[in-house]
Amino acid sequence: MNDVSKASLPKAIFLMGPTASGKTALAIELRKVLPVELISVDSALIYRGMDIGTAKPNADELKAAPHRLLDIRDPSQAYSAADFRRDALAQMAEITAAGRIPLLVGGTMLYFKALLEGLSPLPSADPEVRSRIEQQAAELGWEALHQQLQEIDPVAAARIHPNDPQRLSRALEVFFISGKTLTELTQTSGDALPYQVHQFAIAPASRELLHQRIELRFHQMLASGFEAEVRALFARGDLHTDLPSIRCVGYRQMWSYIEGEISYDEMVYRGVCATRQLAKRQMTWLRGWEGVRWLDSENPDRARKEVLQVVGAIAD
């Protein structure tokens, strides 16, 4: 698409960043001064009843700046990148038709990628192949299967942790079904996003600062009743750690504590570590992201002004 035809497309803003970087606070500030409507891009915020551990915007924040695509699934339900793309496109069209600009804010980079580039033609799940993979895992362990993926698709293996059975089995399943690697297939894009997108990423200047923010926020969540929130989910009886909702960072570790598998101190330690690992993965995505403007989360006023400098002209 040439620059002229691209300029005629409706406008959209991406505000991306690692967990605990101040994305939500900045988005709320921007809504006060720009004709934007917010769309959440977060695979944890979609779940109802999961508010504290996901750092979901509170009632006052949502009153000041409503977020779309929050609380749209029960924790027992699945939600894919394809589901997100469909829902986000519908919301973006509605916002644009009302003469406003969609501002998509969050840290689920796979969702941003699916929205921006379209979805690659991955094969559907095959229960027989998946069962064979799980049987292998039971016999050899997931570490051995990760080594197998390393030989088949080193790029995917570098991105997928050996302790992430869902993503690991999916990467192997894709190869066994199609004969092509996950990396190869994901380089084949679907329909590109029909918007002119201004992309921003917000993060602290150093990893140490981000780690401090993560640890502080995890302790704030605990003080705000995170344990009680997870106990309520646990008491339902229909949720388990194979579900994407309960595998969310923090929830999985608290679940292990409630089940008596680990101590409280170990839960806190693992929860903070898992959140740091999530932030590291998010930063890896962002460093390789094309066309992104970086903002310093330690200077929110300056970050806001930088966005306004770029976006102010398109909002007039």
UniProtKB/Swiss-Prot annotation:
Coiled-coil stretches noted in the UniProt entry, renumbered to this chain: none
Gene3D superfamilies, A to Z: 1.10.20.140, Crystal structure of tRNA isopentenylpyrophosphate transferase (bh2366) domain, P-loop containing nucleotide triphosphate hydrolases
Its EC number(s): 2.5.1.75
Site (Interaction with substrate tRNA): residue numbering on this chain: 108, 130
Catalytic function, reaction form: adenosine(37) in tRNA + dimethylallyl diphosphate = N(6)-dimethylallyladenosine(37) in tRNA + diphosphate
Domain of life: Bacteria
One MF annotation (Gene Ontology) recorded for this entry: ATP binding
Region feature (Interaction with substrate tRNA): 42-45, 166-170, 247-252
GO biological process entries: tRNA modification
Cofactors named for this entry: Mg(2+)
The keyword Transferase belongs to this UniProt entry's keyword annotation: yes
Xref: InterPro entries: Dimethylallyltransferase, IPT, P-loop_NTPase
Function: Catalyzes the transfer of a dimethylallyl group onto the adenine at position 37 in tRNAs that read codons beginning with uridine, leading to the formation of N6-(dimethylallyl)adenosine (i(6)A).
Quaternary assembly: Monomer.
Name by which UniProt lists this protein: tRNA dimethylallyltransferase
